[in-house]
From Swiss-Prot:
PTM info: N- and O-glycosylated.
GO CC terms of this entry: basement membrane; collagen-containing extracellular matrix; extracellular exosome; extracellular region; protein complex involved in cell-matrix adhesion
Entry's Gene Ontology BP terms: basement membrane organization; cell-matrix adhesion; glomerular basement membrane development; positive regulation of cell adhesion; positive regulation of cell-substrate adhesion; positive regulation of integrin-mediated signaling pathway; positive regulation of muscle cell differentiation; regulation of basement membrane organization
Superkingdom in the source lineage: Eukaryota
LDL-receptor class B-type repeats, residues: 990-1032, 1033-1075, 1076-1120, 1121-1162
Function: Sulfated glycoprotein widely distributed in basement membranes and tightly associated with laminin. Also binds to collagen IV and perlecan. It probably has a role in cell-extracellular matrix interactions.
Record's subunit section: Interacts with FBLN1. Interacts with LGALS3BP. Interacts with PLXDC1. Interacts with SVEP1.
Residue numbers bearing the Sulfotyrosine modification: Y289, Y296
Keyword annotations of the record: Basement membrane, Calcium, Cell adhesion, Disulfide bond, EGF-like domain, Extracellular matrix, Glycoprotein, Repeat, Secreted, Signal, Sulfation
UniProt protein name: Nidogen-1
Domain called NIDO: residue spans: 106-268
């Protein structure tokens, strides 16, 4: 659809061709002419990878953008965007423009720096040399303005590669792009400068994860979503989005210097759109061109405008001072007036170097159909769409509906036994469930501080044949909970949807199918302000539940804590017109305050209510009975309650819909209408004459109507689903699933999957989970995966929000609480000392780490914590208690390493950039003052349990088969002031053994109860892994500080060093007691390996050496003879049979596994990022469950406390193998060894 006015054609063609005709001798922009960048300039460096987002870059002054003047931080992404707010992970790749966040996009494409060759640098620069150069660029593009910036954000994408995707386009192999964006700001305005060196853009398209093909890069700006509650797209401007225009970025300009593009992005002139510079390349000031005599043929020159509707927009000649302004009138197409956002495929593009400006104003979008625009300004519009019929639209109807064609289109209608609008149908009389989210920003009483809550769950249950709805909204703060009690209509809308229908009248679901938008305004009489309620119903989801999103904003009167609210039955008139329903009423409610001095004062209050409901109605069926213009909703048995302990708000109402009546709604009405029929909850009530009625079981149930039973269609009709299927019965219905290796065809039958290899989207990164810092992608087999938010975040896994742990006031009153992504910290206020959970008057003495940190920063003149650390300078990190953080990293090089409690580097722990070593803290957290925690063991009940360590305690998690009984998890043992690392279990004496790296020591405790005991506390460095030989009655452990492996009897006596050479960071250790083998891991960064030997130390050899990263945990399953390990470097779990050393990958894509144990078909491992115990099913190679303890700290060792020992014996099982001291089993024999500290007169060594 092109505007063909000859005048517009001539002007635009001339504007697009001028840069070609007038190109002068201006030279190309070289890489050396970019703004200085790199570590030497103090730049920060974005993490290598795909789809990464930087932390917030705090700005010294505000950035202005469109109509905003308060942007104090920006975010830099891998994909060529500078964002004015943190981008959601699902929008971090191309294909979603305009995004919901504010964006400056000099080259929006799917870029990749995983190989480490490409880099993204960014900084804010206040130096005069940089700000002056930015000012010169702006003056060149806008010579008439006076602009002197005080700061500049400089972002450089250097040698970044295109994301290739599975297709691996050979044309893009080895190609890399370099470009730069500078955002310069003064007190009154901001400008963007884009720089593209002549050889900087070697590719112009990238593979789209969303579209599965190559898409062009985009040069654009977007205001992002606007509005607090009801979001809508703000203004946005696109300057290049096809291959030809992107190719010419380095060849042309709008500022007079080739490869340099300047835009005014924040000032009073940019409220509705970004203003580009318009200095034509190669022209001289004062040049004039005749606009009247030239004409061009559009057959050879094509316009570069997208067919997207806006309000009338003036296109000026692309030179300052142009006299002619050409306005394209906009014609609104009624058929598409409610489109959510500007739509329409791009028209053919211009071949000119000049980029056409496309502006999209913040407004309700309009899509415009324009056929011809003549010189007279008359616009002719037409609709070329053919009539829609059931033949190609049957899928728009419910499976329980029929589709019928009419003269102007098609309509859907539910079949007998179902109710709805045809697009959505549910069984008559069947209970319904509604799920959704609630967010709000509410001022209570006269408070000037709003109560804000987000992502709050709403659940509703509806007994349809009674018209009664029960709605619960969880985690509502008590500061606002009681004050929301009068707002029963928040849940009342659900009651209207499923109100009992009287003959000839329809409830909300019959009219809308549960797909509509509702906005209501509540005005409280005698109180200032009002409350706006916005709700969007999105129909039935894949689980058969209706979905709703609710947003509340405004002010409500304060209701005292502990009050009750009573609402009398009421009626409300609903007025209907095409696709719109309105109602208004005045309601009273009684507030009874808590009893004081023997009296409970009550007062009656009033509010006025207005609401509008909009929905999509099928208008093609002229024969359908007209809906009454007015219907009366009768509501009684209104119940409202706020549970202060559970923080749950509850509403319950009974609803019926019918004609306008005066007096009691119950008078002389049929029991079906007033809910006194007594039918089963899975039955429909059929009214008869006067007060007669019958009960009829809903479809999928059978019975007499007063009692209904579910029909098991799968048992009664074994072939109902067809071949290669599994039938699953559900209440009132059934579902069919294809067996493994089959998938549903378009005809609904299961057909074999042909030549389709499953894709692990978690491994390839093509999933839609939130960023790894907030969520994890869990591979579930085949091509399936699930998304789960990490601890400290909430959401559906695709979008995770930080949980504000400071909200419940967890810190001491004399401490500050700092909420951080996924966690929080407490810090005592000045003049107090403590850990933040307990603060007492006094100044705390600084630790060695804090002194060293202050000394280094002071010597470098970098004492301002808001400024970045100077490049090349290493500054140690201290933990919350002032001790050296166990993991230290160099900010410039990216290398990380472990340190001991004195800050000294631990040999063999240094990792390359992008990998973090699994360092252990050697300092226990301080003990909080308060009631003493008993250290006695809490006896375990019978059965098999998982035992895992969490800093200063050991917890138990019962197993039922392979299922974790998470609700029964409890503490087994508290050992304050210790950091327990390794765990092992003796199935004979039912004793658990552990290593502690703080004292250091090795201890044990009985599962039957009693006090724990320390069995070894001398000559230890950093004991980590520990293993038990339950047949030989020995323990083995690794020591990563002394670099050795030792053995001793179970009581800690008779110690002997087995190995003290060729060990760097030994950690996990396990025994194969029956065969007399020992296995251990060494995560030496230079040479990670898994080794084995006999238990006597002979026959030592490397078992696994290739393709290891950070092998942490190790487990041996005596029942299957399988050795498995978890690797925090490769993020894999792997297994092998030591007698047949062919490895197999159990699962990839783990987060940060630490320790592992086995039981049955499962591995169970602790994960540092998830702070969870994760179950991995080896049979299907996927994570099946996860347990997250209430206390969110790191989990360490894990072991299985078996209810009985595995069968088998070795040569040390009986009479200690005839040895005087240590009996150490070997395959088919044993070796008698003496302890290191025993002279030979009473000890005999023999084989």
């Amino acid at each position: 659809m092109l505007a063909s006015s000859s005048r517009i054609r001539a002007a635009w063609t001339r504007a697009l061709l001028l840069p070609l005709l007038l190109a002068g001798p201006v030279g190309c922009l070289s890489r050396q002419e970019l703004f200085p960048f790199g570590p030497g300039q103090g730049d920060l460096e974005l993490e290598d990878g795909d789809d990464f987002v930087s932390p917030a870059l705090e700005l010294s002054g505000a950035l202005r953008f469109y109509d905003r003047s308060d942007i104090d931080a920006v975010y830099v992404t891998t994909n060529g965007i500078i964002a004015t707010s943190e981008p959601p992970a699902k929008e971090s790749h191309p294909g979603l423009f305009p995004p919901t966040f504010g964006a400056v996009a000099p080259f929006l494409a799917d870029l990749d720096t995983t190989d480490g060759l490409g880099k993204v640098y960014y900084r804010e620069d206040l130096s005069p040399s940089i700000t002056q150069r930015a000012a010169e660029c702006v003056h060149r593009g806008f010579p008439e303005i006076s602009f002197q910036p005080s700061s500049a954000v400089v972002v450089t994408w250097e040698s970044v590669a295109p994301y290739q995707g599975p297709s691996r386009d050979p044309d893009q192999k080895g190609k890399r792009n370099t470009f730069q964006a500078v955002l310069a700001s003064s007190d009154s305005s901001s400008y963007a400068i884009f720089l593209y060196p002549e050889d900087g853009l070697q590719f112009h398209t990238t593979f789209s994860k969303k579209e599965n093909n190559q898409v062009p890069a985009v040069v654009a700006f977007s205001q992002g979503s606007v509005g607090f509650l009801w979001k809508s797209n703000g203004a946005y401007n696109i300057f290049a989005n096809d291959r030809e225009s992107v190719e010419n970025l380095a060849k042309s300009s709008n500022s007079g210097q080739q490869g340099v593009w300047v835009f005014e992005i924040g000032s009073p002139a940019t409220t509705n759109g970004v203003v580009p510079a318009d200095v034509i390349l190669g022209t001289e000031d004062g040049a004039e061109y005749d606009d009247e005599d030239e004409d061009y043929d559009l057959a050879t020159t094509r316009l570069g405008l997208e067919d997207v509707g806006t309000t009338p927009f003036s296109y000026k000649a692309l030179r300052r001072g142009g006299a002619d302004t050409y306005s394209v009138p906009s014609v609104l197409s009624p058929r598409r007036a409610a489109t959510e956002r500007p739509l329409g495929p791009p028209t053919e593009r211009t071949r000119s170097f000049q980029l056409a400006v496309e502006t999209f104003h913040q407004q309700h979008p309009q899509v415009i159909d324009v056929d011809e625009v003549e010189e007279t300004g008359v616009v002719f519009s037409y609709n070329t769409d053919s009539r829609q019929t059931c033949a190609n639209n049957r899928h728009q109807c419910s499976v329980h509906a029929e589709c019928r064609d009419y003269a102007t289109g098609f309509c859907c209608s539910c079949v007998a036994g179902y109710t709805g609008n045809g697009r959505q149908c549910v069984a008559e009389g069947s209970p319904q469930r509604v799920n959704g989210k609630v967010k709000g920003r509410i001022f209570v009483g006269s408070s000037q501080v709003p109560i804000v809550f987000e992502n709050t769950d709403l659940h509703s249950y509806v007994v349809m044949n009674h018209g009664r709805s029960y709605t619960a909204i969880s985690t509502i703060p008590e500061t606002v909970g009681y004050s929301l009690l009068p707002l029963a209509p928040v849940g009342g809308i659900i009651g209207w949807m499923f109100a009992v229908e009287q003959d000839g009248f329809k409830n909300g679901f019959s009219i809308t199918g549960g797909e509509f938008t509702r906005q209501a305004e509540v005005t409280f009489v005698g109180h200032p302000g009002n409350l706006v309620i916005k709700q969007r119903f999105s129909g039935i989801d894949e689980h058969g539940h209706l979905t709703i999103d609710t947003e509340l904003e405004g002010r409500v009167p304060q209701i005292p804590f502990g009050s009750s609210v009573h609402i009398e039955p009421y009626t409300e008139l609903y007025h209907y017109s095409t696709s719109v329903i309105t109602s208004s009423s005045t309601r009273e409610y009684t507030v009874t305050e808590p009893e004081r001095d023997g009296a409970s004062p009550s007062r009656i209050y009033t509010y006025q209510w207005r609401q509008t409901i909009t929905f999509q109605e099928c208008v093609h069926d002229d024969s359908r009975p007209a809906l009454p213009s007015t219907q009366q909703l009768s509501v009684d048995s209104v119940f409202v309650l706020y549970n202060q302990e559970e923080k749950i708000l509850r509403y319950a109402l009974s609803n019926s819909i019918g004609p306008v009546r005066e007096g009691s709604p119950d008078a002389l009405q049929n029991p079906c209408y007033i809910g006194t029929h007594g039918c089963d909850t899975n039955a429909a009530c059929r009214p008869g004459p006067r007060t007669q009625f019958t009960c009829e079981c809903s479809i999928g149930f059978r019975g007499d109507g007063r009692t209904c039973y579910d029909i098991d269609e799968c048992s009664e009709q074994p072939s109902v689903c067809g071949s290669h299927t599994i039938c699953n019965n559900h209440p009132g219905t059934f579902r069919c699933e294809c067996v493994e290796g089959y998938q549903f065809s378009d005809e609904g039958t299961c057909v074999a999957v042909v030549d389709q290899r499953p894709i692990n989207y978690c491994e390839t990164g093509l999933h839609n989970c939130d960023i790894p810092q907030r969520a994890q992608c869990i591979y579930t087999g085949g091509s399936s995966y699930t998304c789960s938010c990490l601890p400290g975040f909430s959401g559906d896994g695709q979008a995770c929000q930080d949980v504000d742990e400071c909200q419940p006031s967890r810190c001491h009153p004399d401490a500050f609480c700092y909420n951080t992504p996924g966690s929080f910290t407490c810090q005592c206020k000045p003049g107090y000392q403590g850990d933040g959970f307990r603060c007492v008057p006094g100044e705390v003495e600084k630790t060695r780490c804090q002194h060293e940190r202050e000394h280094i920063l002071g010597a470098a003149g970098a004492t301002d914590p808001q400024r970045p650390i100077p490049p090349g300078l290493f500054v140690p990190e201290c933990d919350a208690h002032g001790h050296y953080a166990p993991t230290q990293c160099h900010g410039s090089t990216g290398y990380c390493w472990c340190v001991d409690r004195d800050g000294r580097e631990v040999e063999g722990t240094r990792t390359r950039p992008g990998m973090t070593p699994p360092c252990l803290s050697t300092v226990a957290p301080p003990i909080h003052q308060g009631p003493a925690v008993p250290t006695a063991v809490i006896p375990l009940p019978p059965g098999t349990h998982l035992l895992f360590a969490q800093t200063g305690k050991i917890e138990r998690l019962p197993l039922e088969g392979n299922t974790m009984r998470k609700t029964e998890a409890k503490a087994f043992l508290h050992v304050p002031a210790k950091v327990i690392i390794g765990l092992a279990f003796d199935c004979v004496d039912k004793m658990v053994y552990w290593t502690d790296i703080t004292e250091p020591s090795i201890g044990r405790a009985s599962l039957h109860g009693g006090e724990p005991t320390t069995i070894i506390r001398q000559d230890l460095g950093s004991p980590e892994g520990i293993a038990v030989d339950h047949l030989g009655r020995n323990i083995f452990w690794t020591d990563s500080n002394l670099d050795r492996i030792e053995v001793a009897k179970l009581d800690g006596t008779q110690r002997r060093v087995l190995f003290e050479t060729d060990l760097v960071n030994p950690r996990g250790i396990v025994t194969d007691s029956v065969r007399g083998n020992l296995y251990w891991t060494d995560w030496n960064r230079d040479n990670p390996k898994i080794e084995t030997s006999y238990m006597d130390g002979t026959n030592r050899r490397i078992l696994v050496q290739d393709d290891l990263g950070l092998p942490n945990g190790l487990t041996f399953d005596a029942f299957s003879s399988q050795l498995c390990w978890v690797d925090a470097g490769t993020n894999r779990a792997e297994c092998l049979n030591p007698s047949q050393p062919s490895r197999r990958k159990a699962l990839e894509g783990l987060q940060y596994p630490f320790a592992v144990t086995s039981y049955g078909k499962n591995l169970y491992f602790t994960d540092w990022k998830m702070n969870s115990v994760v179950a991995l099913d080896l049979a299907i190679s996927k994570e099946t469950d996860a347990f997250q303890p209430h206390k969110q700290t790191r989990l360490y060792g894990i072991t299985t406390a078996l209810s009985q020992c595995p069968q088998g014996h070795n040569y040390c099982s009986v009479n200690n193998g005839g040895c005087t001291h240590l009996c150490l089993a070997t395959p088919g024999s044993r070796t008698c060894r003496c302890p290191d500290n025993t002279l030979g007169v009473d000890c005999i060594e023999q084989k």
